[in-house]
């Protein structure tokens, strides 16, 4: 498909609430494909439609653990390396339906806030109801990186950046230091 430009903090679109998707059309499917391409090109784990300038309630998330590639050849009698669990979602009209009382503080970054990270306190676990691109409703129960990504991307749909809720924000000195999200 196509790469889309990721808009950055300061663009007023990022502070607006996104509109519900009433019908899943080919345009919405193309937008989702473009969002995957854009997110992967930027090494992100999630992307919300407002980040590419579209005020619709659409999110893509991929928190699949990359395979451990240390470059060593496996020994002949070694156990086979298990395939990573694929944790990848397209969420149409996602809605938070439950959060844990327990919270966790972690570093977050954002493709729309390049060069910075912040400490954000979020619920440790979350339940989200959404629809897929075929119109099927489903519920995700996420914790850890998945919970953080779900909450972060749904914030985008509501016009909230992590910088709006971060306890502290710092500039990244080393570009390899960018955390997931």
Q: Model-flagged regions — what are they?
A:
Residues 1-151, 156-181:
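Active-site rim/adjacent substrate-binding subdomains
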């Amino acid at each position: 498909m196509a790469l889309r430009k990721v808009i950055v903090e300061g663009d007023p679109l990022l502070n607006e609430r996104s509109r519900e998707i009433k019908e899943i059309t080919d345009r919405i499917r193309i937008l989702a494909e473009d969002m995957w391409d854009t997110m992967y090109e930027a090494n992100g784990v999630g992307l919300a439609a407002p980040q590419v300038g579209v005020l619709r309630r659409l999110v893509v998330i991929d928190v699949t653990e990359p395979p451990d590639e240390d470059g060593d050849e496996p020994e002949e009698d070694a156990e086979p390396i298990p395939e990573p669990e694929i944790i990848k979602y397209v969420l149409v009209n996602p809605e938070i339906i439950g959060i844990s009382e327990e919270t966790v503080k972690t570093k977050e970054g954002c493709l729309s806030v390049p060069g910075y990270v912040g400490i954000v306190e979020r619920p440790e676990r979350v339940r989200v109801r959404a629809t897929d691109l075929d119109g099927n409703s489903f519920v995700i129960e996420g914790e850890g990186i998945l919970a953080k990504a779900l909450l972060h991307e749904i914030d985008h749909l509501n016009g909230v950046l992590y910088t709006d809720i971060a306890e502290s924000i710092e500039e990244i000195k080393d570009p390899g230091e960018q955390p997931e999200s």
